[in-house]
Swiss-Prot record:
Record HAMAP family: RutD
Job of this protein: Involved in pyrimidine catabolism. May facilitate the hydrolysis of carbamate, a reaction that can also occur spontaneously.
One BP term from GO: uracil catabolic process
Catalytic activity: carbamate + 2 H(+) = NH4(+) + CO2
GO terms of molecular function: hydrolase activity, acting on carbon-nitrogen (but not peptide) bonds, in linear amides
Enzyme class: hydrolase
Taxonomic lineage from the root: Bacteria, Pseudomonadati, Pseudomonadota, Gammaproteobacteria, Enterobacterales
Organism superkingdom: Bacteria
Enzyme Commission code: 3.5.1.-
Cystine residue pairs: none
Xref: InterPro entries: AB_hydrolase_1 (IPR000073), AB_hydrolase_fold (IPR029058), AB_hydrolase_sf (IPR050266), Pyrimidine_utilisation_RutD (IPR019913)
Presence of the UniProt keyword Hydrolase in the record: yes
Family affiliation: Belongs to the AB hydrolase superfamily. Hydrolase RutD family.
Protein name (database record): Putative carbamate hydrolase RutD
């Protein structure tokens, strides 16, 4: 699996791995790259079955497999210890990495994540699946911003959204791969073993997230033994895109604090 690695800003700089959500594209993190690369070696990637890592995914594709293939790719690149920043599905992959490879994951940042899929989130995906079946990729892509962004943010950026739609259609991961990744997301359940995650965790959520209620992050916070929760009042599901200034400050402060906390505990 292909990874994109930034040059380390100094010798032995900590590594931060960015894991996007269901869309799978590493470019999702573009608003964070410049600030992160000043202090960390940053790893981005298109998830298997998407973008520049094309593949046909098995019907039983799982979050565990997503975590394993990423860890193997990191080890092959010479990276054995790393912090993880995961958004939604990416946060699930991050938790799986922390469970399966505890010696490797130094810190986890969960952005609009959850323990197990909430009934409201499931309802949103049911609607989106019906759109996919009835209207194909175009209907899926055109509806997606409604679940990602606040209405006023979208209304002020209509040309940008049209350009994003065209790009998403041109690089659509395919119906079968999308549904198999979505099914992996829906099956994931960390409610019975989140307390085994021992690395420090920062939880970031947006109170106006339409897709994943912020209560899901409260449940995560209660379940994770070494966690802190930060709530953004605005930004929607893709709060790192819509309000990068606020998000980046939380992210940078969280990484610095938790990595120091981890080092002090060793």
């Amino acid at each position: 699996m292909k990874l994109s690695l930034s040059p380390p800003p100094y010798a032995d700089a900590p590594v931060v791995v960015l894991i996007s959500g269901l869309g799978g594209s590493g470019s999702y993190w573009l608003p964070q790259l410049a600030v992160l690369e000043q202090e960390y070696q940053v790893v981005c990637y298109d998830q298997r079955g998407t973008g520049n890592n094309p593949d046909t995914l098995a019907e039983d594709y799982s979050i565990t497999q997503m975590a394993a293939e990423l860890h193997q790719a990191l080890v092959a690149a010479g990276i054995e210890r790393y912090a993880v920043v995961g958004h939604a599905l990416g946060a699930l992959v991050g938790m799986q990495l922390a469970l399966d490879y505890p010696a490797s994951v130094t810190v986890l940042i969960s952005v609009n994540g959850w323990l197990r899929i909430n009934a409201h989130t499931r309802r949103c995906f049911q609607v989106r699946e019906r759109l996919l079946y009835s209207g194909g990729a175009q209907a899926w892509v055109e509806a997606q911003p409604l679940f990602l962004y606040p209405a006023d943010w979208m209304a002020a950026r209509a040309p940008r959204l049209e350009a994003e739609d065209a790009l998403a259609l041109a690089h659509f991961q395919g119906k079968n791969n999308l549904l198999r990744r979505l099914n992996a997301l829906k099956r994931a359940d960390f409610s019975h073993h989140a307390d085994r995650i021992r690395c420090p965790v920062q939880i970031i959520c947006a109170s106006d997230d339409l897709l994943v209620p912020s209560a899901c992050s409260s449940e995560l916070h209660a379940a994770l033994p070494d966690s802190q929760k930060m709530v953004m009042r605005y930004g929607g599901h893709a709060c790192n895109v819509t309000d990068p200034e606020t998000f980046n400050a939380l992210l940078l402060n969280g990484l610095a604090s938790l990595l120091h906390h981890r080092e002090a505990a060793l």
